[in-house]
Swiss-Prot record:
Source organism: Clostridium botulinum (strain Eklund 17B / Type B)
Function: Formation of pseudouridine at positions 38, 39 and 40 in the anticodon stem and loop of transfer RNAs.
Protein known as: tRNA pseudouridine synthase A
Quaternary structure, from the entry: Homodimer.
Its EC number(s): 5.4.99.12
Family: Belongs to the tRNA pseudouridine synthase TruA family.
Keywords noted in UniProt: Isomerase, tRNA processing
Amino acid sequence: MRNIKLIIEFDGTNFCGWQRQIKDRTVQGCLEKAILKITGEKSLTNGSSRTDGGVHAKAMVANFITNSSIPGEKFREALNTKLPDDIAVIKSEEVDMDFHARYSSKGKMYSYTIVNRYEKLSFGKQYVHHVRKELNVEDMKKACECFIGKHDFKAFMSPGSSAKTTVRTIQEFYIEKNEDVIKIFISADGFLYNMVRIIVGTLINIGTGKTKLEDVDNIINDGIRKRSGMCVPPNGLVLEKVFY
């Protein structure tokens, strides 16, 4: 038996997330069908993140066990001939048997992109969140500093999570602005269900003035979901990198 690691990029627009489902189109489902076609084996893949529908990835990591004799680095080319156009394997390699895409991970980085302009948006809507009201980006940047470090992020989690603890450590959190495009980067040792999207919603509230900058620490410490921001749409979210 051999353990194959894949780095995958995908456009999440037309997927119902990563995790395989009986009827709906998912990234994991398409990947496992492609593996079956080239190896003749029904392999179960492990993914580094269980992304929701509409969320994209530049570097999702997956692994699977196989008895195939195909060289590890050749799986990239072989799988890409069988995968749909909105999924691509960008690297493949054989790794130690104890490697697990999810449980071996030490952290992840996500980005979220906002287009901040009053005019309607017609191009690239599947990759950004359009905010018409002018945002105070300087206040948003200051708010990022409040989130860095080890905190209980209960206020930034949607219902339905099976997480044993709501404590996470954010290592990096910063914003880059280029004209009307605001790109938010956040990396942590792990994320709760919808945590990134709710934190971004909170930043937007700060940017519009709905939430005061000085209230951020209390929102984090109180742990009350209704005090934090909305869960912004999935389309602006990208899994940028997984750390091992």
